[in-house]
Amino acid sequence: MSQAYSSSQRVSSYRRTFGGAPSFPLGSPLSSPVFPRAGFGTKGSSSSVTSRVYQVSRTSGGAGGLGPLRASRLGATRVPSSSYGAGELLDFSLADAVNQEFLTTRTNEKVELQELNDRFANYIEKVRFLEQQNAALAAEVNRLKGREPTRVAEIYEEELRELRRQVEVLTNQRARVDVERDNLLDDLQRLKAKLQEEIQLKEEAENNLAAFRADVDAATLARIDLERRIESLNEEIAFLKKVHEEEIRELQAQLQEQQVQVEMDMSKPDLTAALRDIRAQYETIAAKNISEAEEWYKSKVSDLTQAANKNNDALRQAKQEMMEYRHQIQSYTCEIDALKGTNDSLMRQMRELEDRFASEASGYQDNIARLEEEIRHLKDEMARHLREYQDLLNVKMALDVEIATYRKLLEGEESRINLPIQTFSALNFRETSPEQRGSEVHTKKTVMIKTIETRDGEVVSEATQQQHEVL
């Protein structure tokens, strides 16, 4: 609006000064005034007005098909003046003011075009950079989509197979250790049962030994009693012998007295035979009693001796059995201690294996969780790259639209600058023809819009759309 207003002011000033309207095409923006030829004074003298005309040329550049605009200053041209009618005077001060205003406007437009040119070049460089980054991201997305998941899946499956194999090996080892432990527990139970049996046998042997000791004590007491009885019998035998001898002496004395009386009394009957018979009977009875007593004593002594020998043999056998039982108990105790040590070592090894198995299992679970986390991270990163790719596509589309808008603005600015210069074609000014400008400006551009919809890192749908633009 400000440019249009300043342009209308310049036209009004020109009309006030030169009394005529410049020849502009209908609808073209006012860029530079055209000074008609005019005559000065009545003398028909001619003068010239210096006019600076700018030509805008375009060189084809970069990716968008447009290059930076360049304003080149034409050399100063002397415009011959034609003689005005009589009485017409040219106000040079007003023309200089208008010319100065025109130069100021053209300078501002040149600066503005230079800024637009720089901005346009920056946008083109940014578009190139974004296209390169877009291509790199697309290649990375394709690489991640085509290779990494497969490789990660292969590595994941391989590690899972290895972990399963190790778990099976550890399970087999644990089962084998459990079987060995059960066997050792069975052996231990059997040895404990055998130990209990041996302890019972030991108790029975001790009980038998105690009974044998009681029998030995009873036999000893019986032997002592028999010895005392033998002594008493010996004393009784000695006493009976003495009594018998006394009786014999008394009988002999009586016999002698009787013999004396018989000799003295021949008429008395003979008693010697009767005494002799009685003596013989007593001697027979005494010898029989002595022999019976000796036989009974000998039989009792032999019985007691045999019983003592039997008891001694039983005691010795009991002692031997007790010694053997003690040795067996000691050997069983040593064997039990060794088995206890073996059992403790096996239990310790089993606990170590269980701890190692638990630690390895936790490590494998951590590895599985880490691999799953890496897979989720890769999926999230892939989704992020896809979103960035979609955002870059959107930014690229927006930049394409903005570039097209700037291109149209620049084309309008070129047409606004170039159209006033076309009015000076009679003066043989060098300018670019509209056909060349059209051939330089109008280029065809194809924009491919690829829409990728993702959900949880997975590609759900893809859509491709092509737009053809004529620039």
Swiss-Prot record:
A GO cellular component entry from the record: nuclear envelope
Protein task: Muscle-specific type III intermediate filament essential for proper muscular structure and function. Plays a crucial role in maintaining the structure of sarcomeres, inter-connecting the Z-disks and forming the myofibrils, linking them not only to the sarcolemmal cytoskeleton, but also to the nucleus and mitochondria, thus providing strength for the muscle fiber during activity. In adult striated muscle they form a fibrous network connecting myofibrils to each other and to the plasma membrane from the periphery of the Z-line structures.
Protein name: Desmin
Residue numbers carrying ADP-ribosylarginine: 58
Positions of region (Coil 2A): 270-288
Residue positions, PTM Omega-N-methylarginine: 16, 37, 70
Residues with Phosphothreonine modification: 17, 77
Chain segments carrying region Coil 2B: 297-413
Region (Coil 1B): 153-253
The species this protein was found in: Sus scrofa (Pig)
Linker 1, as annotated region: 143-152
Recorded family membership: Belongs to the intermediate filament family.
Encoding gene per record: DES
Stretch list, region Linker 2: 289-296
Modification note: ADP-ribosylation prevents ability to form intermediate filaments.
Gene Ontology biological-process entries: intermediate filament organization; nuclear envelope organization; skeletal muscle organ development
Interaction with NEB: annotated span: 269-416
Pfam families, A to Z: Filament, Filament_head
Subunit record text: Homomer. Interacts with DST. Interacts with MTM1. Interacts with EPPK1; interaction is dependent of higher-order structure of intermediate filament. Interacts with CRYAB. Interacts with NEB (via nebulin repeats 160-164). Interacts (via rod region) with NEBL (via nebulin repeats 1-5). Interacts with ASB2; the interaction targets DES for proteasomal degradation. Interacts with PKP1. Interacts with FLII.
Entry keyword set: ADP-ribosylation, Cell membrane, Coiled coil, Cytoplasm, Intermediate filament, Membrane, Methylation, Muscle protein, Nucleus, Phosphoprotein, Ubl conjugation
Gene Ontology molecular function: any one: identical protein binding
Keyword rRNA processing applies: no
Region (Head): 2-109
Positions marked as site (Stutter): 355
InterPro entries: IF_conserved, IF_rod_dom, Intermed_filament_DNA-bd, Intermediate_filament
Annotated segments matching region Interaction with CRYAB: 439-454
